[in-house]
Curated annotation (Swiss-Prot):
Needed co-factor(s): FMNH2
Organism, scientific name: Escherichia coli O6:H1 (strain CFT073 / ATCC 700928 / UPEC)
Catalytic activity from the UniProt record: 5-O-(1-carboxyvinyl)-3-phosphoshikimate = chorismate + phosphate
Protein's UniProt name: Chorismate synthase
Cofactor: binding comment: Reduced FMN (FMNH(2)).
Binding site for NADP(+): R48, R54
Pathway field: Metabolic intermediate biosynthesis; chorismate biosynthesis; chorismate from D-erythrose 4-phosphate and phosphoenolpyruvate: step 7/7
Pfam families: Chorismate_synt
Molecular function terms from GO: chorismate synthase activity; FMN binding
Length: 361
């Protein structure tokens, strides 16, 4: 299986399956001398891990990360950093009934078509369980970006089903189980989740991620544009079906006179572009949104076929999230951090000596 690595100078390679012994990743390109401990990674892993609220899957994994290499006496050595998380709460028997059945809306059918076989236990490699390692690697990038460049990366839920969520107060995001920045909508979200659990159904969501303090100049035209790499990274997250940068698809209804981000001596007067122009960061906030589909792991019966071509009824058992968008927030932050760190290292490698007299805000 190819496609397990992202990045060029800052490279992250993950391995492992949902019900395997462990998940792991190798992180290459981390500069030496950066203070790093397992505790630095654990905070974001705790934000993502399952079983932390009644609104997410009740699979209870501690997700305790171990640093296997690349750190000596509390600082990075510049060599490959090996990370490992053991799986401890697998219930593979929950999936024995579907070993020959293709769950609709999942990767069962496509994995078997591609490889001729599949790990049916929780989806195997296609499970979002894999994203725990992305979050661990992303925590390294977030620490580096914050300490060396003052870059802050934050994410939140901005829509669940037909409930839009305004970014009113970032401080509220960590104070509720929905990563919701709008305290006035918590009761509505709670009511929706209760209804979904009662119905045995699920719902989609929109997640927004914002990077502040990003310097101008990141991005490698033409095929490695910063927005292209961000879209690639976010689209690689399980259940993501759409990505927008800045105003995204809303620009279709705008005139050029409305959409252009005019510049005065005081700086940009708007940010419809989401902080990226011509594939290169402008120094404004980088803003990206991603749409996540409702999970197909529901108890509402549905039609499918088995590997023998017979039509069967499918009712998913096991422990699943009614809205996968909730736990996707720290994953989106991690993927944005990975892309930004990679591009910062690339910019430093090629253009460290470039100086301009153009104003920066």
């Amino acid at each position: 299986m190819a496609g397990n690595t992202i990045g060029q100078l800052f490279r992250v390679t993950t391995f492992g399956e949902s019900h395997g012994l462990a998940l792991g990743c190798i992180v290459d390109g981390v500069p030496p001398g950066i203070p790093l401990t397992e505790a630095d990674l654990q905070h974001d892993l705790d934000r993502r891990r399952p079983g932390t609220s009644r609104y997410t899957t009740q699979r209870r994994e501690p997700d305790q990360v171990k640093i296997l290499s690349g750190v000596f006496e509390g600082v990075t050595t510049g060599t490959s950093i090996g990370l490992l998380i053991e799986n401890t709460d697998q219930r593979s028997q929950d999936y024995s009934a579907i070993k020959d059945v293709f769950r609709p809306g999942h990767a069962d059918y496509t994995y078997e078509q591609k490889y001729g076989l599949r790990d049916y236990r929780g989806g195997g490699r296609s499970s979002a369980r894999e994203t725990a390692m992305r979050v661990a690697a992303g925590a390294i990038a977030k620490k580096y970006l914050a300490e060396k460049f003052g870059i802050e990366i934050r994410g939140c839920l901005t829509q669940m089903g037909d409930i839009p969520l305004e970014i009113k107060d970032w401080s509220q995001v960590e104070q509720n189980p929905f990563f919701c920045p709008d305290p006035d909508k918590i009761d509505a979200l709670d009511e929706l989740m209760r209804a979904l659990k009662k119905e045995g159904d699920s719902i989609g969501a929109k997640v927004t991620v914002v990077a502040s303090g990003v310097p101008a100049g990141l991005g490698e035209p033409v095929f490695d544009r910063l927005d292209a790499d961000i879209a690639h990274a976010l689209m690689s997250i399980n259940a993501v079906k759409g990505v927008e940068i800045g105003d995204g698809f809303d620009v279709v209804a705008l005139r050029g006179s409305q959409n252009r981000d005019e510049i005065t001596k005081d700086g940009f007067q708007s940010n419809h572009a989401g902080g990226i122009l011509g594939g290169i960061s402008s120094g404004q906030q980088i803003i990206a949104h991603m749409a996540l589909k409702p999970t197909s792991s529901i108890t509402v019966p549905g039609r499918t076929i088995n590997r023998f071509g017979e039509e069967v009824e499918m009712i998913t058992k096991g422990r699943h999230d009614p809205c996968v968008g909730i736990r996707a927030v720290p994953i989106a932050e991690a993927m944005l951090a990975i892309v930004l760190m990679d591009h910062l290292l690339r910019q430093r490698a090629q253009n460290a000596d470039v100086k301009t007299d153009i104003p920066r805000w």
